[in-house]
Amino acid sequence: MTHPSRCAHPSTAGILGEVGGDIWAGLADQFVDGAYASVKGLVRTYVLHQQLLEHLPAPPASVLDVGGGAGHQSFPLAEAGYEVTLLDPSQVMLDKARQRLQRLPDETQRRVRLLEAEGENAEAAVDGQHFAAVLCHGVLGYLEQPEPLVDQLCRCADAGGVVSIMTGNAKAMAVRPAMERRWEDALAAFDARHEVGVLGVPGRAETVEEVSDLISNRGVEPVRWYGVWLFIDWLEFGGTELDPSDSGQAAAIAAVELEASRRDPYRQLSRVFHLLGRKRPN
């Protein structure tokens, strides 16, 4: 299952059982400055970036990042020359995005637009604009009904455009409790869909097949799916601490994780998966 400590975050109105309020206001520092600064955060950003580049058209194509948080995934695309619109419902997270954006070159800043809106209202928020790529990473797992959001993702993609979704892998739910030696929880997790994340936020997982059906029914042809992280997860839950300042080690881990994300059986054991599809012609 995806967790807010490691991934993008959901619409506050759709979190399982949560209604109203910006619950991410109290988690933003830990989310932005903690999780993404860890080796796992660095690996996640690198692996997803490389996977995206295998499918995106060349810059300056337009990219919409729905639930994009502080821009950890889409700002590197802006640095690579893409025109990025980051949409997020949390004012606090958007403030974090602005702070990070100010540290980037002026040319990159001019390629980024920040919008405060729920993902379920994405099409209206962007005034009906269509994008060469629509990203939604770590959001679906916090919605009891993902269909309205998926509908918006697919509607915002241009014909031939890419839809990129990362969410929790329902077929790997036992990994975390087993690595934490919570054996009763691990046994129950084989058939579970819900869990409470490390920050106490509840969520659910999907299968690749289920999300593939969701986008296919909305005019987007599934193209390929990947894992995202595997070994780094096992190290963390096994109690191994890694130094994010050791750039050589982080790069070596990222290279291994990228290769594992493409291959069976490794990708099947990743606790999250990354599905990419392409919008069919109108």
Describe each PLM feature range.
Residues E147-V162:
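A short glycine-rich, Lys/Arg-flanked "PGG" loop and its adjoining helix->strand segment in the class I
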Residues L135:
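A conserved beta-strand element that flanks and buttresses the S-adenosyl-L-methionine
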